Amino acid sequence: MVDHNQKLLQELLKKPGNNVCADCGSQGPDWASYNLGIFICMRCASIHRGMGAHISKVKHLDLDRWEDSQVQRMKEVGNVAAKNKYEERVPPCYRRPTKNDPQVLIEQWIRAKYEREEFCHPERQSYLSGTMVGFLMKRGKEDSRYQLRKFVLNENEDTLKYQHASDGCSRASGCLGRIFDHLRLKNLGRLRYHVKENKEPKGVLKLSELNVSFAPSKIGHMNSMQLTFLKDGSTRHIYVYHEDPEVINCWYTAIRCAKLHLLQVAFPSTPQSDLILRLPKDFAREGWLWKTGPRPSDVHRRRWFTLDTRKLMYHDEPLDAYPKGEIFIGHESNGYQIKVSNTGNGCKEARFPFHLVTPERTFCLAATTHEDRAGWLAVIQQALKRPLTPQDSTIEATLVRKRTTSNSISIFSGR
């Protein structure tokens, strides 16, 4: 039998804003933080519980017993009022998570709101400064080992640099517990541990051309990112992680904020809302597909495909530093299209073929399941219909120039 307080809670759920999770926006929240006065989903409730009862006191709407004072608090606040308070000064560059986003993004969003109160106190948003210095574990280009590297972000120079740390600090287990990143140093006011590093950077990445995405499932670490950029006309991937989820999220946000500021300088008359749409996005889709060359005698090869906005890249393995090939997907009005093939292709694993048609050639691809093919067709079709941006045109010109000037290694090869 439903008691009086539970009936009141169900009525409160019908008020505007209360019918979705206050943190991730998922429908039908069945939990609440009664001291904060918000309705939340089960996933976010577990994060609230992890912050401790001194920050958030969590109860199930139906399974727990509610006191009158707790219900009154829910009535006084609610999701809309709580958002107005705890999200008052969210920077435009900050990525607001949704229910399908990585755990680290949702968790740090919640902790930033209620634990650190970053959006009530803008001075705590150090990722807006345009500079950041710290250490991340980086995967080797030629091997799978992760080594400690110093990273330096400088918005004024439009660069993200990284360089070797000393051999004595090459393992996460020993050094990451002793190294204080930029955010920690600002609070401590002094550096207790020093790390020697080479003066010359090992790599210099252009922030304005850099894409960054969380990659926990691919890298196998909850607090990990993939950095993607063009190097000598080809795409380069860098994989990094940090043991502290707050640190990796701050790096992610600092890169987004720096990129937005650079876009505002480059396109001063473009509305900020349009520029935000150009900030780094997660890959539209990744996964295994079968690929074959244009000749009937060509064999099917299993490749890891990644769709990054308009670049469809394929690799031998998911964590390769470079793709084996890259296909630019232009607008459908320029001769690009996707076709479903229902004919057999001679490969029992590649049961669901489809063709990506470009002005230069047709790429013969295949998925293992009907559902997987449908997923790829959907995201590629979206890319075909989307108008090209100036960045898209730059990438297209770079890839075409690479294709026409390189005879030994072609990014449009049949590999």
Feature-to-residue mapping (PLM):
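Intrinsic disorder
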Residues: D3, E11-N18, Y34-N35, R65, ...
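Disordered regulatory linkers adjacent to lipid/PI-binding modules
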Residues: L128-T131, K259-Y322, F328-I329, S333-K348, ...
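Canonical RING-type zinc finger of E3 ubiquitin-protein ligases
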Residues: Q27-L36
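Long, non-globular segments of proteins
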Residues: M1-G17, C93-Y94, E107, Y114-C120, ...
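Pleckstrin homology
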Residues: A112-S129, N154-T235, Y241-L277, D282, D308-T362, A383-E396, ...
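Cys/His-rich, Zn2+-coordinating zinc-finger modules
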Residues: M1-L13, M42-S126
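Short cysteine-rich clusters marking metal-coordination/redox-active sites
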Residues: C21-C24, C41
